[in-house]
């Protein structure tokens, strides 16, 4: 099949429609011949096509036609285009509307684009009546009437026949088409002789109801039947037009309907393009519950007998396989035989006679039950990233469930509580070969961005790894017993006693080094905990092995160690009983007594405070402060429990070192003091969205407590532990949280899935080019992919070593640090980076040596400097900054830290060049990789409890998915959270006083109203000065609040005001008022709204506290800073303040408006990264890539839009935009087939690599070189001859 490089869209012309010879002329018929269900329109439901005789898999259908008897029917989707054209011509004479007469001898093709635009403006500028002296009629405005379903004259609502419009449009001369932006013959906007009937394939029969009668058909078929019926009756133009519109897009004439039509099935997320072409249901698939198996490796998947006997795989007949196929036929193992010459598939059954069908010629194939070791794709949904779908070798296993190795459970996000997985057996040999390499677990061992292994030990294996390392005094037989089948090659080296460390050294099997962890393949760490054996850890032994050698060794270690850990457990056993958790009741009784005592003290103190407030002895705190103090007391109680449990664990470890529960804690598996607190101590405060449950009827959550009770237990503090059990009310509070979480999970799954799909669609065509740059189409996004031009799975986070005077080359390192340090102080100077990105894990090649054997200090510096200069020029073309790489090598290989030999240094830099040369291939789909990693992580977060909000000063800054969603949607005209940071608190206080909302009611005023005296009302407002001070305002501000409210009040006619100091604690504001009529009513209104309406600042439910924190200027320079967050629409509101030396951190749109697109990109990148929280620094690269794409043009663009990136028509159509194909056809667009979506449609391999280079030879270049060389040799020979002649 020829490779299609370009596609052009256009409208069907009438000749193409008329060319089909399948005429549809009946509404009903006994055998459906001549109806819209005619068998000649394609194969359906197992029946062969009556036109081509093929099955529904091979026949793509045939078009029919129904006569419309010379009626002109408008193609419904182009009604607006016809109205646009009619606005440019006179409906009477058909000439172009113009202010002045124009000549028809203009050659528009010779005009430049600018000249054409000027002519267009001149000719098409409007005038009221036609310039044609033979017409002179006023121009008519033509519109389409939804009610009459035809074109009408807007002035008098008189029908304008389609035939008249047709004649006027086709009479426009072709030379004027560029002026009117007509791209093809206007007749194509109409159906004239025949209307096309689409093939059966797009309208499969389904059951639905019409007028309470069940129909076994398709709604499109039903609508087509109505068109045929009206055409047979030779109905009016409007009747046929209406039937065609109902079939095409009913929304053109009716807004409140949702019936299925062509527009409906090609738009939205259930469009046919997405459901039947981009992805569809497949044969040779299976689905079952999954379970673990200890007998299969990471590279295998266990398949039960019933799936093996159902799925079949093809064996193609050729010279190599013909004998095998004959054997299979003889042994009755063949299920199907396909004869290519006869184009016939034969099912082979026991005892069935087959005559002249089996020829076994090349190209034929047989289907047999799937065999062991065949590669099969399997995965668990939701498939959030590529580690959820892998291709492994089939193994036969017992039982009825699919078996997977526990080592891959993490990457599949699978547990064994009823999870299901699907599997598909690909039939194409090319697909099988491709999947068996690119989707094989060994290939996928290391995470694309994180760089750590995605496979590793789970559950009991972690404890086994810990216990095995600690075991001592093993004899050889015991070692060989633990090693099992892997013990054959174990070399005792003359020793009689062995430890767990020796077993690990044997399993590692390589002379590998790593600072503080490995020395010559031997573990030098104190313990082996979960960090060494589980997935997604940078210290994973499997990861270090694969960094040192290859993924094969890494996977091999996982397989061997998993087997050994399981054997260790089966020999020595491991179990946790309730006795391990709670040897006796002494400790839990003690904890319970402490908890009861403390909660009573808290309640007592709280009750005393409430009584004192009621009696007027003290001034009450604000509600927020009161809640904070209560919460802080309860948190102290929780922390007390944790401290007691930590002490208990420490003591138990001394008394009972073999306690299995504590072994788990030490191994880093499952057990931590907080979880033990729930079981043994207290279940703690239950929260919904980060807050205690809100009170409801009678000021309480549950009827277990008195109305308006302030009891902390009545707001969800559960005192009991799970060991003691929960009371009725406590159980209710725990279920309240469970209910809100389950609801959140249901909703968030949908939201995260939607955004994930949008991000992948946005980033899918972003690839690495041959120079290691990131491009999308012809647009350059990043100069250096992954910053290092090395595959993301090869890059490695390493410790960031800060400059120190004890270092060799201190001055050079300091100078480099000063150039790059800005990138390591981030998040408004609150955080200092502890890690940085190394181009590869060179630390596994660092072998310490003695001073005598070490490379000279100057030689090592020169080597590092020369390598970096060479790489900067040859690989990064001096365009990208790679100072960070030089800094890493200078600090980590610093002679003051470690001495290495010259050979070690050469090895490290040879590996560096190797990674630069061979890991990151042109075409690597870095966009899809980044999009999947981002999406997988925010989905996991949204489904965990991470999306609770965090109080960041005043405004609750949303964390997690919500904020990420807002950032990528980039909504304009919304308030943004502005952060102000300064070391001078007074500058922030002036902003706070102006913006913080304070109303009179918050100051707990004492109102008193005197009767009307001397024709005026007197209102006394007495406020305690303590409340004014607590609100951080002054008496003058309170006076201003009252004055401002009264002066703007429309119900006050006249007013006056006096301020008095009542006593040392109180101040009195006396207001004199006259109201407009009706006075009594307005007085009541005034008194009612006074507490809330007399206010200052921006109305908000949040306060604006100023918090202090330690800010970093450098790793060794900190200072006290004050921070305040405020919600503003625009930074102009800050214009009247003195903000000198105040750092203002605006939102994304304010950043863009002030500093431009590059600053917006940096803001977006950091803001998106911050939504993930701690420990996700490795997501910086995908966040940066997404931010760079959103800011690739002059203005930030939402993930929902493709305004700047030239998204192809097929990509838009796949995305659910059914207008994309219509517009492309109307404008006769031509587009290259480059992007993923377009390649999918035209069976073209997308321009995406696999991380490997494609090598090719440019023969033309060789020929040119050959000519140059021959010319050079010729000239050299002539020169030599001339010199000889001279002698």
Curated annotation (Swiss-Prot):
It catalyses: RNA(n) + a ribonucleoside 5'-triphosphate = RNA(n+1) + diphosphate. One of its GO terms (biological process) is DNA-templated transcription. Pfam families: RNA_pol_Rpb1_1, RNA_pol_Rpb1_2, RNA_pol_Rpb1_3, RNA_pol_Rpb1_4, RNA_pol_Rpb1_5. Its EC number is 2.7.7.6. Gene3D superfamilies: 1.10.132.30, 2.40.40.20, 6.10.250.2940, RNA polymerase ii, RNA polymerase II, clamp domain. Keywords: DNA-directed RNA polymerase, Nucleotidyltransferase, Transcription, Transferase, Virion. It is found in: Virion. GO terms for cellular component: DNA-directed RNA polymerase complex; virion component. InterPro entries: DNA-dir_RpoC_beta_prime, RNA_pol_asu, RNA_pol_N, RNA_pol_Rpb1_1, RNA_pol_Rpb1_3, RNA_pol_Rpb1_4, RNA_pol_Rpb1_5, RNA_pol_Rpb1_clamp_domain. GO terms for molecular function: DNA binding; DNA-directed RNA polymerase activity. Its main location: virion. The keyword Transport does not apply. The keyword Transmembrane does not apply. It comes from the Viruses. Belongs to the poxviridae DNA-directed RNA polymerase 147 kDa subunit family. PANTHER family: DNA-DIRECTED RNA POLYMERASE, DNA-DIRECTED RNA POLYMERASE III SUBUNIT RPC1. The DNA-dependent RNA polymerase used for intermediate and late genes expression consists of eight subunits Rpo30/OPG66, Rpo7/OPG90, Rpo22/OPG103, Rpo147/OPG105, Rpo18/OPG119, Rpo19/OPG131, Rpo132/OPG151 and Rpo35/OPG156. The same holoenzyme, with the addition of the transcription-specificity factor OPG109, is used for early gene expression. Part of the DNA-dependent RNA polymerase which catalyzes the transcription of viral DNA into RNA using the four ribonucleoside triphosphates as substrates. Responsible for the transcription of early, intermediate and late genes. DNA-dependent RNA polymerase associates with the early transcription factor (ETF), itself composed of OPG118 and OPG133, thereby allowing the early genes transcription. Late transcription, and probably also intermediate transcription, require newly synthesized RNA polymerase. This is DNA-directed RNA polymerase 147 kDa polypeptide.
């Amino acid at each position: 099949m020829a490779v299609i490089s370009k596609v052009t869209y256009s409208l069907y012309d009438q000749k193409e429609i008329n060319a089909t010879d399948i005429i549809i002329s009946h509404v009903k018929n006994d055998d459906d011949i001549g109806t819209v269900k005619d068998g000649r329109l394609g194969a359906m439901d197992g029946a062969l096509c009556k036109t081509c005789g093929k099955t529904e898999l091979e026949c793509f259908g045939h078009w029919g036609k129904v006569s419309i008897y010379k009626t002109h029917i408008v193609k419904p989707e182009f009604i607006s285009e016809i109205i646009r054209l009619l606005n440019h011509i006179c409906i009477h004479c058909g000439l172009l509307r113009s202010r002045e007469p124009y000549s028809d001898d203009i050659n528009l093709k010779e005009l430049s684009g600018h000249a054409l635009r000027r002519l267009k403006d001149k000719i098409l500028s409007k005038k009221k009546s036609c310039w044609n002296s033979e017409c002179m009629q006023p121009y008519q405005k033509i519109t389409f009437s939804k009610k009459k379903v035809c074109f009408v004259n807007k002035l008098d609502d008189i029908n304008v026949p389609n035939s008249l419009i047709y004649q006027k449009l086709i009479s426009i001369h072709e030379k004027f088409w560029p002026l009117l932006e007509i791209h093809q013959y206007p007749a194509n906007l109409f159906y004239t002789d025949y209307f096309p009937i689409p093939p059966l394939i797009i309208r499969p029969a389904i059951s639905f109801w019409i007028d309470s009668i069940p129909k076994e058909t398709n709604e499109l078929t039903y609508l087509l039947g109505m068109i045929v019926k009206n055409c047979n009756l030779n109905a009016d133009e409007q009747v046929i037009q209406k039937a065609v519109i109902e079939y095409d897009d009913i929304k053109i004439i009716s807004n409140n309907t949702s019936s299925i039509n062509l527009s409906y099935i090609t738009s939205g997320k259930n469009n046919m393009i997405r459901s039947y072409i981009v992805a569809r249901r497949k044969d040779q698939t299976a689905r079952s519950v999954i379970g673990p198996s200890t007998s299969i490796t990471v590279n295998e998947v266990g398949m039960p007998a019933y799936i093996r006997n159902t799925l079949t795989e093809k064996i193609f007949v050729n010279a190599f396989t013909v004998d095998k196929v004959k054997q299979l036929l003889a042994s009755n193992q063949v299920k199907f035989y396909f004869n290519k010459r006869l184009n016939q598939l034969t099912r082979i059954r026991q005892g069935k006679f087959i005559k002249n069908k089996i020829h076994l010629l090349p190209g034929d194939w047989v289907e047999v039950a799937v065999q062991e070791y065949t590669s099969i794709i399997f995965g668990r949904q939701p498939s959030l990233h590529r580690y959820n779908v892998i291709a492994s070798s089939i193994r036969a296993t017992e039982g009825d469930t699919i078996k997977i190795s526990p080592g891959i459970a993490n990457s599949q996000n699978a547990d064994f509580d009823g999870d299901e997985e699907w599997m598909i057996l690909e039939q194409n040999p090319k697909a099988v070969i491709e999947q068996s390499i690119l989707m094989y677990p060994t290939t996928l061992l290391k995470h694309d961005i994180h760089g750590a292994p995605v496979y590793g030990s789970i559950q009991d294996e972690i404890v086994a790894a810990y216990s095995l390392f600690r075991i001592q005094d093993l004899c050889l037989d015991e070692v060989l017993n633990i090693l099992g089948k892997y013990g054959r090659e174990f070399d005792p080296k003359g020793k009689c006693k062995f430890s767990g460390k020796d077993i690990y050294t044997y399993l590692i099997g390589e002379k590998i080094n790593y600072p503080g962890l490995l020395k010559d393949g031997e573990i030098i760490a104190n313990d082996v905990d979960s960090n060494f054996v589980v997935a997604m850890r940078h210290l994973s032994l499997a990861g270090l092995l694969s960094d040192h050698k290859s993924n094969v060794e890494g996977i091999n270690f996982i397989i061997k160690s998993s087997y050994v850990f399981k054997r260790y457990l089966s020999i020595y056993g491991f179990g946790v009983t309730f006795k391990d958790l709670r040897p006796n009741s002494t400790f839990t009784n003690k904890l319970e007594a402490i908890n009861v005592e403390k909660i009573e003290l808290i309640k007592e103190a709280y009750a005393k405070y409430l009584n004192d407030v009621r009696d007027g002895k003290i001034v009450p705190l604000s509600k927020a402060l009161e809640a904070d103090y209560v919460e802080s007391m309860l948190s102290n109680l929780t922390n007390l429990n944790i401290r007691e449990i930590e002490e208990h664990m420490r003591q138990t470890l001394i008394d009972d070192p073999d306690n299995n529960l504590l072994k788990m804690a030490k191994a880093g598996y499952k057990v931590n003091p907080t979880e033990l607190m729930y079981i043994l101590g207290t279940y703690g405060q239950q929260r919904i969205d980060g807050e205690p449950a809100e009170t409801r009827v009678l000021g309480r959550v549950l009827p277990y407590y008195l109305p308006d009770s302030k009891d902390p237990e009545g707001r969800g503090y559960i005192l009991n532990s799970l060991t003691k059990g929960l009371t009725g009310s406590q159980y209710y509070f725990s279920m309240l949280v469970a209910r809100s979480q389950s609801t959140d999970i249901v909703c968030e799954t949908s939201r995260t899935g939607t955004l994930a799909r949008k991000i992948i669609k946005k980033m899918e065509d972003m690839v690495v080019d041959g120079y290691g740059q990131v491009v999308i189409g012809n647009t350059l996004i990043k100069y250096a992919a992954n910053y290092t031009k090395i595959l993301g799975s090869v890059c490695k986070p390493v410790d960031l070593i800060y400059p120190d005077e004890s270092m060799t080359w201190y001055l050079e390192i300091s100078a480099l640090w000063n150039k790059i340090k800005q990138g390591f102080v981030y998040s408004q100077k609150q955080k200092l980076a502890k890690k940085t990105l190394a181009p590869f894990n060179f630390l596994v090649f660092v072998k310490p040596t003695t001073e005598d054997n070490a490379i000279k200090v100057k030689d090592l510096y020169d080597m590092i400097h020369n390598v970096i200069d060479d790489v900067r020029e040859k690989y990064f073309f001096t365009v990208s900054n790679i100072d960070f790489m030089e800094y890493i090598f200078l600090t980590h290989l610093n002679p003051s830290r470690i001495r290495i030999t010259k050979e070690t240094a050469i090895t490290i830099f040879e590996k560096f060049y190797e990674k630069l040369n061979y890991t990151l291939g042109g075409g690597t789909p870095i966009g899809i990789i980044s999009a999947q990693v981002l999406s997988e992580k925010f989905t996991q977060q949204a489904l965990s409890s991470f999306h609770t909000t965090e109080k960041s000063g005043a405004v609750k800054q949303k964390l997690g998915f919500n904020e990420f969603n807002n950032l990528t949607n980039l909504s304009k005209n919304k308030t943004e959270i502005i952060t102000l940071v300064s070391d001078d608190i007074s500058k922030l206080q002036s902003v706070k006083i102006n913006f913080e909302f304070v109303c009179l009611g918050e100051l707990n005023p004492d109102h008193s109203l005197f009767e009307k005296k001397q024709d005026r009302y007197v209102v006394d407002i007495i406020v305690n000065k303590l409340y004014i001070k607590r609100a951080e305002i002054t008496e003058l501000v309170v006076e201003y609040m009252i004055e401002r409210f009264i002066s703007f009040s429309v119900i006050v006619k006249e007013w006056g005001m006096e301020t008095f100091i009542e006593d040392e604690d109180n101040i009195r504001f006396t207001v004199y008022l006259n109201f407009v009529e009706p006075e009594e009513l307005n007085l009541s209104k005034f008194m009612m709204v006074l507490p809330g309406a007399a206010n200052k600042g921006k109305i908000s439910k949040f306060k604006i506290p100023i918090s202090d924190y330690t800010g970093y200027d450098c790793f060794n320079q900190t200072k006290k800073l004050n921070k305040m967050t405020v919600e503003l629409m625009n930074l102009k509101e800050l214009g009247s303040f003195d903000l000198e030396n105040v750092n203002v951190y605006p939102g994304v749109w304010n950043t863009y408006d002030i500093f431009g697109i590059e600053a917006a990109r940096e803001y977006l990148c950091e803001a998106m990264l911050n939504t993930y929280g701690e420990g996700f620094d490795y997501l910086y690269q995908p966040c940066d890539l997404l931010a760079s794409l959103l800011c690739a043009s002059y203005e930030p663009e939402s993930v929902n839009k493709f305004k700047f990136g030239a998204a192809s028509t097929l990509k838009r159509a796949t995305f659910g935009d059914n207008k994309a194909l219509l517009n492309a056809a109307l404008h006769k667009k031509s587009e290259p087939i480059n992007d993923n979506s377009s390649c999918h449609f035209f069976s073209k391999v997308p321009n995406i690599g696999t991380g490997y280079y494609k090598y090719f030879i440019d023969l033309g270049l060789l020929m040119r070189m050959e000519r140059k060389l021959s010319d050079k040799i010729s000239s050299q020979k002539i020169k030599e001859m001339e010199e000889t002649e001279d002698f």
